[in-house]
């Protein structure tokens, strides 16, 4: 298969040509319908050939695209009256994780997710979506609040991993993640986790314990990045593509292993091509699952969640 980024560039160039023709036709009052149709058909064919045959490494690159919708994008489309909360009440706030309350189709919910930036400046402010311990403690504070007020919890996962700087380690990064895993496993309210981009290691898992876990079609979820694995195994980060092929990190792989419950389709070209469509599909999925989960008694909800967690990684 051609290099993913080269193919993506060719598609962008063709899209640009189509837009130019449309604008030229409008401005000069000429009929270019035939030419535009030919290019549109060519574009659709290129997209099908590219996106219907993606290898794992290409999916890694697609999951990392800066253009993909973020947690705040989905909150804007799915949650009305959203109010963001800040701070962990121990140390400070962490902009790599956003969280708050709002209404999902009239249902009061708590929403929490990793937040990457839209450009370089925003990424620096958001620490490229890599949370510090205070981010995970903020998330847990909101989850405990959701439990108290019996609000379902929605989490959006999109991080390359928890931040591994000295300050983060000194403030208890590992402990913060571990406590989230423990507490999320026994929260007395429904939890639905959605991987929307990168699901990197414990940094992703700290928001990923749920009664239902789903992934977007071109998202990834793994215990380590392909670059990290290739560096450990072969002392060579340039072998990341080989590592990705081995890791079974795609949504399809994880669904087949019963690690996740559902794969949500993305439009041709990825979620960034039609974020409204993806949001609608997330809405449909979450509505149905919340309907089922809210009918369960608390004891049954926790028992099913425990069984789900314990069954991950079991081979028969």
UniProtKB/Swiss-Prot annotation:
Domain CoA carboxyltransferase C-terminal per the UniProt entry, residue ranges: 35-292
Gene Ontology cellular-component terms for this entry are:
acetyl-CoA carboxylase complex
Q: Which reaction does it catalyse?
A: N(6)-carboxybiotinyl-L-lysyl-[protein] + acetyl-CoA = N(6)-biotinyl-L-lysyl-[protein] + malonyl-CoA
Could you confirm whether the keyword Membrane appears in this record?
no
- Where is this protein chiefly located? cytoplasm
The record's section on SUPFAM superfamilies has: ClpP/crotonase (SSF52096)
Q: Which UniProt keywords apply?
A: ATP-binding, Cytoplasm, Fatty acid biosynthesis, Fatty acid metabolism, Lipid biosynthesis, Lipid metabolism, Nucleotide-binding, Transferase
Q: Where in the cell is it found?
A: Cytoplasm
What Enzyme Commission number(s) does the record list for this chain?
2.1.3.15
Query: Has UniProt tagged this entry with the keyword ATP-binding?
Result: yes
**A Pfam family reported for this protein in Swiss-Prot or TrEMBL:** ACCA
Kindly give the PANTHER family that the UniProt entry links to this protein: ACETYL-COENZYME A CARBOXYLASE CARBOXYL TRANSFERASE SUBUNIT ALPHA, ACETYL-COENZYME A CARBOXYLASE CARBOXYL TRANSFERASE SUBUNIT ALPHA, CHLOROPLASTIC
Q: Which HAMAP family match?
A: AcetylCoA_CT_alpha
Assembly mode = Acetyl-CoA carboxylase is a heterohexamer composed of biotin carboxyl carrier protein (AccB), biotin carboxylase (AccC) and two subunits each of ACCase subunit alpha (AccA) and ACCase subunit beta (AccD).
Q: Which family does it belong to?
A: Belongs to the AccA family.
Question: What is this protein's name?
Answer: Acetyl-coenzyme A carboxylase carboxyl transferase subunit alpha
Species the sequence originates in: Alkaliphilus oremlandii (strain OhILAs)
According to the entry, what is the taxonomic lineage of the organism? Bacteria, Bacillati, Bacillota, Clostridia, Peptostreptococcales
